[in-house]
Amino acid sequence: MKSRAALLWGIGEEWKVDEIDIDGPGPGEVVVKTKVAGMCHSDEHVVTGDMLMPHYPCIGGHEGAGEIVEVGANVTSVQPGDHVSMSFIPSCGRCKWCVSGKSILCDLGAKLFDVGMMTDGRMAHHHGSTDLARMCQLGTFADYLLVSEDAVVKVEPDLPWHAVALVSCGVSTGYGSAVHRAEVEPGDTVVVVGIGGIGINAVQGARIAGAKRVIAIDPVEFKREKAMEFGATHTFSSMEEAAGPLAEITWGEMANKVILTPGVMKGEMIQPALDITAKGGTCVVTAVASMLEGEASLNSFMFAMMNKEIKGCLFGSGNPRADIPALLSMYREGLLKLDELVTRTYTLEEINQGYQDMRDGKNIRGVITFD
């Protein structure tokens, strides 16, 4: 099968759109015609080298939605014509983590950065004689995807494609950071640091969970304004600027929950985040740091004495097969904002402009639409 795809040939290079060849589906595999792909910051981490790929060139993209057009042998959960949301977190339903309700940690996740197919390890994507890797075993920046059945979640066919795409990564991750990992409760004061595609959804997750105050922190005024539309009650440009007013409005208690969702996580952000976290409070680290980032500084004495905790968070600590349908149901009922997340749509050929707009702070979420 022929397909267009956005390829990254090395660290620091631009995406190049070219024609590729995709093999037919093997057992347990499906072919998906992409309808919408989300432009997540994690793909930018691959460009900058903060997230190292095991092989170049690679097909970018891990957030998206599409229609099943072909299935391989032994596929039982979907059939041609089904609409699906892509899941960069696979869910086999058989490993220890899946059967104990923690499919976010499915053992298949160890294969996310493998070069070959998740199913049998073969190379199935090619540019001429050159084999191609794929971002998170997906590669949604392409007209067609060949993926494991375990990496798609069937959804209702009348839902708009952009909504189905957005819940496959950014929305689930941000919402879950507040609801599942931070465990925001009614009456809480919540701080979200970094208002991009993930942070904005942590804001609305905290609002939906009943937070009394939601403080959004971002240096970009446009993003602070958008945060107010999604449920923020206060905004500031930095944690340092927020500290004084936060102490005043909480009578010195500070934030019950702090969620870190900046574009790039840095170790030096931990202590300022703990400084605005209340006694017994929780600091959730969702943002991706460079794989080479080896240190985080904190006052370990005060950390222990104030009984605070730091939690890592992947995909909002949720369950893709449960969360994706649940979030789409909330969207259908008007409880979750998805349409308002899309700042601008692009063609595949405009992918580099889309990522430049993201770097310039112009987008909450850009999406690529396909014919």
What is each model feature region?
Residues 263-335, 370-371:
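Glycine-rich phosphate-binding loop and adjacent beta-alpha segment
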Residues 1, 240-241, 257, 271-275, ...:
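C-terminal hydrophobic helical "lid"/dimerization subdomain
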Residues 4, 16, 21, 33, ...:
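Residues located in well-ordered beta-strands
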